[in-house]
Amino acid sequence: MITAQTFRLDGRLAFVTGSSAGIGLALARGLAQAGASLVLNGRDATKLRATAASLRAEGFEVHERAFDVTDAEAVKANVDSIERDIGAIDILINNAGIQRRAPLHEFSHQDWHDLMQTNLDSVFFVGQAVAQHMITRKKGRIINICSVQSELGRPGISPYMASKGALKMLTKGMAIDWGPLGLNVNGIGPGYFKTELNEKLVNDTTFSAWLTNRTPSRRWGEVEELAGAAVFLASDASTFVNGHILYVDGGVTAQL
């Protein structure tokens, strides 16, 4: 029987990468509101400490680990440290990501490398390190933050599209390999949300007018609106959901 308790995350530890601000912070706060304890992650230790302190002031149990998720050795060391010193990771959200905008024929090799490292390699590194622990317990939830660009394209962001399209298939591959071992691996595909990453687009009146007309819900998303999807995929309400990408996009992917 489904009740409100089915969606509760009390007693569970959630590790969220790229969670010092924006979508990652909104996801972390949503999990905490459902009862989870948190481990936040980011590269900027000062910013991360401030974010953790603000969440603690809201009454949540919060830890932080500042490290670069594109560094495989640092990932392994920190995941092992979390498991040893804080507790077993029940929920992983791979949220860290970056954007670079340029026509493909002008896109630098370094920007391509940086984007793929952050948006794709890090998910493999963190996902593998956490899954190795989850597999020993025969349970765990992994949620990868994909994008509507896992399905749809726009000019000037081809490498980003490639990274998010690959992430969609990596998510499915993780579910195929790790599902038989007790893990549930799914993705969330955000549409267009008001974030620091999209600040220029939000302030571009021409683009905003096009986007709101293109979106059946006729507006930009607010980051808090992603939290429900994360809580669902992290909770006992989704025990038979595996290898799925849940698009939270106001209907953008529903129409041409």
Label each region the model flagged:
Residues I2-T6, L152, V231, N242-L256:
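Short C-terminal tail/terminal secondary-structure segment
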Residues L13, S20-A21:
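Conserved glycine-rich cofactor-binding loop
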Residues P103-L104, D111-M116, I142, F207, ...:
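Substrate-binding pocket helix/loop in short-chain dehydrogenase/reductase
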Residues H105, L152-S158, P180-L181, R218, ...:
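Active-site loop immediately N-terminal to the catalytic Tyr-X3-Lys motif
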Residues G127, S163, T171:
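Active-site helix of classical SDR
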Residues Q132, I176-P180, T239:
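Alpha-helical segment proximal to the catalytic Tyr-Lys
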Residues S147:
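Residue(s) in the substrate-gating loop at a strand-loop-helix junction
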